[in-house]
């Protein structure tokens, strides 16, 4: 959730929206990273 933010700016926006849910952040990057 720190190295993918610059690699995936699209999911980054969603991460900011779900910043309250840190666990959801991992799910987001996991789906885009893989």
Curated annotation (Swiss-Prot):
Its main location: secreted. The keyword Iron does not apply. GO terms for cellular component: extracellular region. The keyword Transmembrane does not apply. Its EC number is 3.4.21.65. Keywords: Hydrolase, Protease, Secreted, Serine protease. It is found in: Secreted. It catalyses: Rather non-specific hydrolysis of proteins. Preferential cleavage: -Ala-|-Xaa-, -Tyr-|-Xaa-, -Phe-|-Xaa- in small molecular substrates. Thermostable. The active site is at 33 (charge relay system). One of its GO terms (molecular function) is serine-type peptidase activity. It is an enzyme of class 3 (hydrolase). GO terms for biological process: proteolysis. Belongs to the peptidase S8 family. This is an extracellular proteinase with a general specificity for apolar residues. This is Thermomycolin. It comes from Malbranchea cinnamomea (Thermophilic fungus).
């Amino acid at each position: 959730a720190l190295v993918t933010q610059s690699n995936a700016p699209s999911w980054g926006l969603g991460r900011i929206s779900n910043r309250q849910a840190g666990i959801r952040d991992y799910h987001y990057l996991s789906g885009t990273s893989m």
